Structures are given as C-alpha cells and as structure tokens.
Amino acid sequence: MIGRVKRAYQRRKVAPKVRDGVVQKKHRHLATAALGFVVDRQSPAKGCRHIVTKRDIHEFTSIIPNWSRIREGLEGVVLTRGDDVDGLYRFYSKDRTGSIEIPAWDGDLWTVVTLEHFEEHRALFQRLAVPFEPKDGGIECRFTLPQAKAFLLLHVFLHELGHHVDRMQSKQQDSSRRGESFAEQYANTVSSLIWPEYVRVFGDPTRSAA
C-alpha cells in the first residue's frame, strides 16, 4: 500500500517456517516428489493478487541453465496467498525434498521498501528500469506489471532456488548451510546470466516503464 514502508523481501517472517533451509513443521505436507515437478496455486489473500502464473514458472525454469539437474530434490513451486511471508524455501526432512513458495503481490504495484532493501537490490531495479523516489522513510518503487513479475522471478524465485542449490550441495543435503549470502549471490549471478533469454521469452520489462 502506498504511504507506508512495506516489508522488504527478506524471505522470512514467522516461526516455525523454514529458516535458511532448516526444516519446520507447522503445515501438513503430502509428498509430491512421485508426481514430478508440480506448480500449485493458492487463492490470493484479500488485497493480494497473483502476478506470476503457473505457466510463467514453467517458462522461466526452461531458461535456467542445467535446470533438469538443479531441480533434483525439488518437489515444485507453490504460488502462495501472499499475506505472511515474502518468498520461502521449505525443506521436508522425511522425504528429503524441498519446495519454493512465491507470494501473491500485496497491495499496489507502487510500493515503498526500506532503504536497505533498495540498496541491496539497486542493480536489479536499475536493470528493470523501475522508477523510484524517497518517500515515507523509505524508497517508493513504481513497478509496472511486467517489472513486478520480473522482480519476483529474477530475484525472489532465484533467491529461494539458491537455498535449494545450497542444500543439495551440502554433504548431508539436510540444510542450506551457506544461508542468505549464498542465496543472494546465486540469484544475482543467474539473473544476469539469463537476462537476454528472459527478455526473449517474457518481453522486455523496461519498455513498460513510464
């Protein structure tokens, strides 16, 4: 909502959800590994809307290098209702699998983020040509729909995928030991690498900038 500083995409909010790839037990889980890679969609919470679609996820993963190998141990993606966390990687210890959650967008496309969050992601905001200005103790980012979708895919999704890669590269494959810094670096690296393919598949989000 315009006029207040919204939570930055910190990817973590409430216990007992996964924290840096460590298992949590709050929600029931039915293993879907036997079904292959599954993309599920929850109804958005009040005031939220899904910007990323199931088709977007399938098209986006098709341009990630070595996706068939990277997706090993990943059950799928859930497009969540969007009212509690900003993106999440869950690890299910019993099944030795994980899943990625991408939230519905909360409120207006124009959103105020913290200065810290803005600086951490300035390079991507500039690549997407997102207009911005200081407002209400933070930075108002004036996303268009294509820019918001690009941010969710090129950063939020890839960040959570980074936690999965981190876990799968660990000796026991039971936790994402390198944490947020590895996931952030992974997202930034892959985002830059696949940018030309992203534009080819989804169109250039900078053309929608005011």
Predicted segments — roles?
Residues 1-127, 134, 138, 142, ...:
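A metal-dependent hydrolase signature that marks the N-terminal structural subdomain at the beginning
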Residues 60-68, 161, 190-194:
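Hydrophobic, Leu/Ile/Phe/Ala-enriched alpha-helical segments that form helix-helix packing faces
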Residues 101, 205, 209-210:
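Aromatic-rich peripheral "rim/lid" segments of glycoside hydrolase catalytic domains that contact
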Residues 105, 167-170:
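Short strand-loop junctions, especially beta-strand C-caps/beta-turns
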Residues 109-111, 165, 173-174:
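Short catalytic/ligand-binding loop motif for oxyanion handling, primarily in non-cytosolic enzymes
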Residues 133-157, 170-175:
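Short pre-active-site segment immediately N-terminal to the catalytic Zn-binding motif
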Residues 155-168, 183:
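Active-site recognition of the HExxH zinc-binding catalytic motif
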Residues 176-206:
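Post-HExxH zinc-binding segment in Zn-dependent metallohydrolases
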